[in-house]
């Protein structure tokens, strides 16, 4: 088993979980800051937004997780802030981040559609890297299986949990996000192939579809009244993305995404 603590200096412990999230964030900000000027948004606007959105998204992700695991946390109130042990829900972070983005664009008089198109590929990369934090913490895994011989030994060892090998759902989602990133980066380079806003819509449909399937393999899903919350949210994202594309294609005067 991999030690979840990457570095310890006296009482200060730096967890791999945090390093994975921060690594994803740094790469995402870099990519977004390079793309933003092409859409008339300064790199400084990206940095300013991240300084506001990232901490709020972490809080939102934690609140989302705690709400649906309240039966546990009501008895362990001291653990509510212990995010270094894992337990932040991506959908909580995405919802919070989207709300902050809309508020930021309104305040700075920026086009939110352009901002969302810039953010979507970067978010995919951040999620792909961040999922490895779940791997280190041995969370977000799937059902028990007899073997994982198709995977490298270090993954097999880390996925041996509670006496059984587990489906590495973290890996599936990480690769799914990475594949989505590659597709959209290639697609958006083709002239007049995507309308403004459709990169964001692609993200909603792509991530929602992958998460809908992968969530069904997991054994630690957040539940509400016996329902896997993330599957319903995923289905909602797909519907929103499809409706957005259909309406966008029917509208006249919508400009094409241009690099």
From Swiss-Prot:
For this entry, list what GO says about its biological process: lipoprotein biosynthetic process
Q: Where in the cell is it found?
A: Cell membrane
Query: Which family does the UniProt entry place this protein in?
Result: Belongs to the Lgt family.
The gene is lgt
Superkingdom, natural source:
Bacteria
Describe its function.
Answer: Catalyzes the transfer of the diacylglyceryl group from phosphatidylglycerol to the sulfhydryl group of the N-terminal cysteine of a prolipoprotein, the first step in the formation of mature lipoproteins.
Q: What is its EC number?
A: 2.5.1.145
Q: How does it sit in the membrane?
A: Multi-pass membrane protein
Keywords carried by this UniProt record: Cell membrane, Membrane, Transferase, Transmembrane, Transmembrane helix
The record, for NCBIfam families, names: lgt (TIGR00544)
**What protein is this chain from?**
Phosphatidylglycerol--prolipoprotein diacylglyceryl transferase
Q: What class of enzyme is it?
A: transferase
Annotated positions binding a 1,2-diacyl-sn-glycero-3-phospho-(1'-sn-glycerol)? 131
Can you name a GO cellular component term? plasma membrane
Q: Please give the pathway this protein is involved in.
A: Protein modification; lipoprotein biosynthesis (diacylglyceryl transfer)
């Amino acid at each position: 088993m991999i030690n979840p603590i990457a570095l310890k200096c006296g009482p200060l412990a730096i967890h791999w979980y945090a390093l994975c999230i921060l690594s994803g964030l740094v790469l995402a900000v870099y990519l977004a800051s390079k793309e933003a000027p092409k859409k008339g948004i300064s790199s400084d606007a990206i940095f300013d937004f991240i300084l506001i959105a990232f901490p709020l998204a972490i809080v939102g992700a934690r609140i989302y997780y705690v709400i649906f695991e309240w039966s546990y946390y009501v008895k362990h109130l001291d653990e509510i802030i212990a995010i270094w042990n894992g337990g932040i829900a991506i959908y909580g972070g995405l919802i919070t981040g989207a709300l902050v983005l809309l508020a930021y664009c309104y305040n700075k008089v920026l086009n939110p559609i352009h901002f969302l198109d810039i953010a979507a590929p970067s978010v995919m990369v951040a999620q792909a890297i961040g999922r490895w934090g779940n791997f280190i913490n041995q969370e977000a895994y799937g059902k028990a299986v007899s073997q994982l011989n198709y995977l490298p030994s270090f993954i097999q060892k880390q996925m041996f949990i509670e006496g059984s090998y587990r489906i590495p759902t973290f890996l599936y989602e990480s690769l799914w996000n990475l594949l989505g990133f590659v597709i959209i980066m290639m697609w958006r380079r083709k002239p007049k192939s995507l309308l403004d806003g459709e990169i964001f819509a692609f993200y909603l449909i792509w991530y929602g579809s992958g998460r809908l399937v992968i969530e069904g393999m997991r054994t630690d899903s957040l539940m509400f009244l016996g329902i896997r919350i993330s599957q319903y949210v995923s289905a909602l994202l797909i519907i929103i993305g499809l409706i957005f594309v259909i309406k966008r294609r029917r509208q006249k005067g919508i400009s094409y995404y241009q690099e």
